[in-house]
Amino acid sequence: MMSSENRSHFSASCSSITEEARAKINLALHVTGQRPDGYHLLDMLVTFADHGDRLDFVPSPTDAFTLSGRFGGTLAGGSGTNLVLKARDLLRAAIGPLAFPVRIHLEKNLPIASGIGGGSADAAATLRGLTRLWGATLPEEALAALALKLGADVPMCLESRPLIARGIGEELEPVPELPAFAMVLANPLKGVSTPEVFRRLAEKNNPALSLALSRPQTADWLAAIAAARNDLEPPARELVPEIAAISAMLQAHGALLTRMSGSGATCFGIFATMAAAKDAAAALHEARLDWYFQATETVSGGV
């Protein structure tokens, strides 16, 4: 039962909050070492797509959580491990009695465990949305600390702008010069074990990410990204051969650059224009109705 204080806040608020949980794209991912606790040290160039999940937050007499979207059924039945609920509970514990009950609806448009930060983006969107709904005034540092407790990717998803991420993902540096890219996200909808990908790494002390651009134009960025790597892609391709196939399909349909994001299995192809990206996504979807293809544009560094 709600306390009288919670009831008053619930009755006084009739608004709802909507947050977008943007797909996180690893344009480059270099594994540079491993800590004694087992966590791998990474250098990453990260951006975010216009496409993603969507979360609605509405005051409610009791807590509730509902799902929809193409991939909502995958999460159904596993709500106990859902990062959205973990984020809600963690933020509520930090805020205290002002955190009245809320109904959360998640429209799950991103594939599960696919290397584009869907769960982390959902958790970050929950922190942002409930902070607004509950009228909380947490310092940015405190909110970032809560995000890190939920996972190494959540702090960068909290910002959802182009970043260089180092350490285990918690050391963030904005990249305001990064342009927007027309892109197709592609996934064969086959799971990849992240621990197994890391276990199969041939080398865990690789050269750090270097992005020295004299003229940061789009073509220069493309060249710099092409010269970088995703060190997780070779072992992921060993586990899921479809990753190589889907990358080749993107190239065959005009992608200027292709790469796997995160630990997979999502790959991205960068295209010259959004029209070209949309045409490619439509053709790829017709070729493989059982796979995931999504044309999108990434955010620019000046978001």
Curated annotation (Swiss-Prot):
GO MF term set: 4-(cytidine 5'-diphospho)-2-C-methyl-D-erythritol kinase activity; ATP binding
**Superkingdom of the source species:** Bacteria
**Reactions this protein catalyses:** 4-CDP-2-C-methyl-D-erythritol + ATP = 4-CDP-2-C-methyl-D-erythritol 2-phosphate + ADP + H(+)
Q: Name one GO biological process term.
A: terpenoid biosynthetic process
Q: Which Pfam families match?
A: GHMP_kinases_C, GHMP_kinases_N
> Catalytic positions?
K24, D153
Q: Which family does it belong to?
A: Belongs to the GHMP kinase family. IspE subfamily.
Q: What is this protein called?
A: 4-diphosphocytidyl-2-C-methyl-D-erythritol kinase
Organism of provenance: Rhizobium johnstonii (strain DSM 114642 / LMG 32736 / 3841)
